[in-house]
């Protein structure tokens, strides 16, 4: 069997809702209804997250359901426990066979009884894999899914009404909107013509209507055309992200980059004045 990433090689950078959704769907097709032979961890941080004793409890467990919540992937097992995975900055799944050697950056691996192996591949070792017992909630507090049709101006107004900080980091807070990250938050703000430094609670309802529409539009486009973003690929598919110094497609001004919350924010200083 030829080893293959679920996305691209090298792995995608900064997976957000569309990428994690596709990863979950491919993972579901590969493992749902199948039985785990063993789970191993191959990096110190992952060994702390999933100790050997916990990994042993996964043996001969049938994977009954795979789902996504925000950027989290959940493998629900026959005994009621849940294996919880998160890609963080640049994780990816890789499919191989149990008789093949592990890749250099494989941080955890799931061997199935049919000989299939799913590897959690992550060059920066920031990804995670944890086991949660029956009845335990594996998830942190999460807001509404970014692709939920109910996400509208009223939801955004309520979620942002007490926030005095800038809108861009607020949109990336998973307790506000689950699944939205740095790339698509920047793209949605550009479409809605909202300055990323605008105070969250001060944005008018009319702008929030535009913002909700922009979030749905950006994610719909990415879901329909899921080419994966890396440092050197697919830059032209974005309007502002990673386009510092390039011309805004709407007004021709140069895209700017500013630091916000330890991340780079890209925006048009003319289109996004408000």
Task: Show which residues each predicted segment covers.
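Structured catalytic/nucleic-acid-binding cores of DNA maintenance enzymes
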Residues: 2-274
């Amino acid at each position: 069997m030829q080893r293959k990433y679920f996305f691209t090689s090298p792995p995608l950078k900064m997976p957000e809702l569309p990428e994690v959704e596709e990863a979950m769907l491919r993972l579901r097709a590969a493992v749902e209804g199948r039985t785990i032979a063993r789970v191993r961890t191959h990096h110190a941080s992952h060994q702390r997250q999933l100790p050997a004793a916990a990994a042993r409890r996964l043996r001969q467990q049938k994977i009954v359901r795979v789902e996504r919540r925000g950027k989290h992937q959940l493998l629900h097992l026959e005994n009621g426990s849940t294996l919880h995975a998160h890609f963080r900055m640049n994780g990816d799944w890789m499919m191989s066979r149990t008789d093949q050697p592990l890749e250099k950056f494989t941080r955890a691996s799931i061997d199935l009884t049919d000989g299939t192996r799913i590897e959690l591949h992550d060059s920066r070792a920031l990804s995670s894999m944890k086991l949660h017992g029956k009845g335990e909630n594996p998830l942190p507090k999460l807001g509404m899914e970014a692709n939920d049709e109910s996400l509208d101006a009223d939801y955004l107004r309520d979620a942002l009404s007490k926030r005095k900080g800038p809108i861009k980091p607020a949109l990336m807070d998973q307790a506000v909107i689950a699944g939205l990250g740095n790339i698509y938050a920047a793209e949605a703000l550009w479409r809605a013509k909202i300055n990323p430094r605008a105070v969250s609670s001060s944005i008018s309802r009319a702008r929030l209507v535009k913002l909700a529409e922009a979030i749905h539009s950006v994610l719909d486009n990415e879901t329909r055309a899921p080419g994966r973003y890396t440092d050197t690929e697919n830059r032209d598919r974005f309007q502002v992200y990673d386009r510092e110094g390039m011309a805004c497609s709407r007004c021709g001004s140069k895209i700017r980059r500013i630091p916000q919350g330890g991340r780079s924010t890209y925006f048009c200083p003319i289109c996004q004045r408000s």
